[in-house]
Amino acid sequence: MGKVIVKIKLTNQGDLVTFNRKLSKTKPRTVEVDAMVAPEATLLYLKPSVIKKLGLERTDTVRSKTTNGDALRFKYASVRLELMGRAEEFSVIEVPEDVPNLLGQVPLEVLDFVVDARGQKLIGNPAHGGEQMTEEY
């Protein structure tokens, strides 16, 4: 399967909450970036340059299994991720600048997208008629 690249919109969730509660008149920091769809990865992984533009606060350190072995990675405060008309809040794991932004399995599951390997694109889950749906069983 070839690489599937998507354009994602990211908004600093803390900024968004503060703005929506009218505690700040400053618009939330937002960026649009390309991300590689990576179902073999777990979470949402962003480059340091993207994290800096969003002004995200470091919250923790996590262990991560990578193609180069185990690594310690920084975890950051949440972003609102928007993709193809769907949106949800996700925490962020930092990857080195030379690694692409990665959209892993958890965001794909929550947003209910799957990779169409034949078409080399991301699509709404056909098991749910292409519409976003949660499963509770």
How does the language model describe each region?
Residues 1-137:
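Pepsin/retropepsin-fold aspartyl endopeptidases
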